[in-house]
Amino acid sequence: VLLIRLKLGLPRIDEALEGGLRRGELTLFCGEPGSGKTALTLQLASKGCHEGLRVLYVYSDGLFPYPRLELLARKRGAPLDDLSSKFYVLHLKSLEGLINVVRRMELALLNYDLVIFDTFTAPYRSIKVENKRETVLHNKKLNQIAAILKKHAIDYGEWVVLTSRLRSPATNEEIFEDLVASNVLTYWSDNIVSVAKTDLPHQRKISLLKIHGQGSRVEVTTRVVDGFLEEVD
């Protein structure tokens, strides 16, 4: 596969990314639940399949939304055969499962061009953090996992994409997760894409906070159409 840049299919976002996500990069999509992170990753996965990439989608939020992916393929006029032959889903239920997937990637036992973890930090939400020492240990473990994924992306010229929720001022587990996303994932990510809800129910604001390792302030307004994101003219 000779493709060098992988587009999201949102013209102004892809332009700001200088043509798209580069091989060897770790990209973070972050936002509150329901903001549109999965919509973006599905769009990216569909685009990857259409470009001939082998896509692994590691999903941890219940049943994988196959109908949405098939709908997107039909909208783009892409053959569904591409999905069946190039697209593979792994369901995650625990932190041990996440560690196992990353270990298999490290040992080159999983051979894909694009690997998406959605939601990457979900396995950590099941962990009960009872003291500061446990928080430090879990942060250290996640730091190691993120470092392995970053090195893997570089060594094998792959695209690795993670999604993470933002902090909600509700519970300690969300505070812990926000700490993880801010201090660990942000550090290792080459690109950071924030997806936020607005006052309008079907409108989303996409902010590029980091582009190819450099800070950014690019913002683009999008709208939700058939469960996916399109730029607003």
How would you label these PLM feature ranges?
Residues H152-D233:
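Phosphate-binding/switch region of NTP-binding enzymes
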Residues R103-V184:
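P-loop NTPase motor core
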Residues V1-L3:
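Charged, amphipathic alpha-helical linker segments immediately N-terminal to NTP-binding catalytic cores
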Residues R22-R104:
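Conserved P-loop
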